[in-house]
Amino acid sequence: MNRIDKRFAALKSQQRRALIPYITAGDPAPQHTVGFMHACVEAGADVLELGVPFSDPMADGPVIQKACERALAKGTRLTDVLDMVATFRATDAETPVVLMGYLNPVERMGYEHFARRAREAGVDGVLMVDMPPEEMAEVAPLFSEHGLQSIFLLAPTTSPSRAATICRHGEGYLYYVSLKGVTGAASLDVDAVERQLAPLREMTDLPLCVGFGIRDGDTAAAVGRVADGVIVGSALVSRIAENAETPEAIPAALKAVLGDMRDALDRSDGR
């Protein structure tokens, strides 16, 4: 069983929600990323999303765009990101790792080469923002052969027929984008999210995890009452940016944000 499936099965049996942090690999410099990954796990992360830096991250807001710029300026490439996962795996064989990014770097490497390298490194899932399930269907068997799950995004603007297609092709978990627009947007209507998730639960048994707008323990707990997991990105990447000149301070900053969210989720009264 894939590490992602194992983790969500364990969480379900414990009636707990997943805490899924996102950080951009190589930000502020490649040598720090593995330490940040371990810090996230120590703070209570259940799954790690590791962003592959790309020069045109169209779905991301300015916070993550700048993180990509910092990582690329330090020479971070897809092959480096895979090396980071391999290094992480040397001391953590349990925490699922999902690579999140855009199609271009994977296409340049070649799907088969990427899938093999990702398997060898210990990657569990892949979420390519700009690759729809119809196109992913062509490479999904290759990914599956190498133990990589294909994870997809859903949004408030996704039509019911489109949502059904995504649910049919999805694996691991579904990433529900709670807000229209780009990452880092401000307002979050949890009641609206609950209404939007309801029909999706009729379509799939996959865990539904919500991202965009998760800023602190309160928003994490509120979303955790209606979703199977919360995904936090910009709130963490902002802390990395604030401490880019003193990277030794970043693990504690990440732990502070995630620790607050973990505590809030665990205190939550359930759904």
Curated annotation (Swiss-Prot):
Record bears the keyword Protein transport: no
Domain of life where this protein originates: Bacteria
UniProt keyword annotations, A-Z: Amino-acid biosynthesis, Aromatic amino acid biosynthesis, Lyase, Tryptophan biosynthesis
Enzyme's top EC category: lyase
Catalytic residues (UniProt): 49, 60
Pfam families noted in UniProt: Trp_syntA
Reactions mediated catalytically: (1S,2R)-1-C-(indol-3-yl)glycerol 3-phosphate + L-serine = D-glyceraldehyde 3-phosphate + L-tryptophan + H2O
Documented EC number(s): 4.2.1.20
GO molecular function: tryptophan synthase activity
Biochemical pathway: Amino-acid biosynthesis; L-tryptophan biosynthesis; L-tryptophan from chorismate: step 5/5
PROSITE patterns from the UniProt entry: TRP_SYNTHASE_ALPHA
Annotated Gene Ontology cellular component terms: cytosol
NCBIfam families, alphabetized: trpA
Subunit composition and interactions: Tetramer of two alpha and two beta chains.
Family statement: Belongs to the TrpA family.
Function: The alpha subunit is responsible for the aldol cleavage of indoleglycerol phosphate to indole and glyceraldehyde 3-phosphate.
Protein name: Tryptophan synthase alpha chain
Gene that this sequence comes from: trpA
